[in-house]
Amino acid sequence: MRNAVIVGYKRSPFTFARKGEMANIRPEDILSQTINQLLNEIQINKNDIEDIITGCAYPEGAQGNNIAKIVSFMTDMPEHVAGMTVNRWCGSSMQAIHDATGAIAINSGDVFLCCGVESMTFIPMNGLTYDPHPQLSKDNPNVYMSMGITAENVAKKFDISRKEQQDFAISSHSKANSARETNMLDNEIVPITNNDQIINKDGGIRPNTSHEILDGLKLAFDENGTVTAGTASPLTDGASAVIVCEEEYAKKNNLNILARIKSTCLLYTSDAADEEDSVDLGG
């Protein structure tokens, strides 16, 4: 059995969509800069790269045309290096790692670039043209459930109060701000440039978040719910890249092995026993 290992990783800063520092930077540029800086640090022969596998939830518009292959031309890859875009919604970039792990196991390559990219500025939630199937959306509207409603369903199912959500949000922002201010994230974040602008810090952190502020926010998704804009996932622009390679290749090339991927799995998002509730959590 050929083992897959991770030998390097980088990400761009994550900034607010539409109003953040990277709102006017195309997703291909964010991803290609992330890849370039990863490969500048981890010295791998580009000729050894089998495939660039890129997760993207909305592969259309600026993120369309197989963005994984598009960025190969923006990162000076040899022509034979392939590119594939995969979509498993929020798990898309993780799926890229799953695919590389499986390919390595069956001897379909030694080195893979596994990436993720999303500019929710360029491609908004629900894509450029939202067009659900008329009959399916009528018969089973949960198929098209949004992440906001998913959050509400999780809160209801596991009895997570608004206060508990706000406690977690405040703690999360505080920890993230502490990490940012003490430069603990600098080893994983690469600076993204846009003309004379350099973005090298996460932009979605609100260190002054408090219960007083969060208490004043309106409910975002359900008038009888608990989730607000202050406790929901933000709309974000960003990219990431990981080098996954075969273990013996890593050792032969003196690469620092950070992790070994022993197995992968897919997990259904509902633990409901009866069929009526089987899609109540969303995905």
List each language-model region with its residue ranges:
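Conserved active-site "lid/cap" helical segment
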Residues: 1-57, 61-71, 75, 82, ...
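N-terminal extracellular/periplasmic Venus flytrap/periplasmic-binding protein-like
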Residues: 10-13, 24-33, 41, 164-252, ...
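Active-site-proximal alpha-helical scaffold in enzymes
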Residues: 86-117, 155-185, 241-248
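Flexible glycine-/small-residue-enriched beta->alpha junction loops
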Residues: 105-154, 158
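Conserved small/polar residues in nucleotide/adenosyl-binding loops
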Residues: 268-274
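Hydrophobic alpha-helical segments, chiefly the membrane-spanning helices
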Residues: 279-283
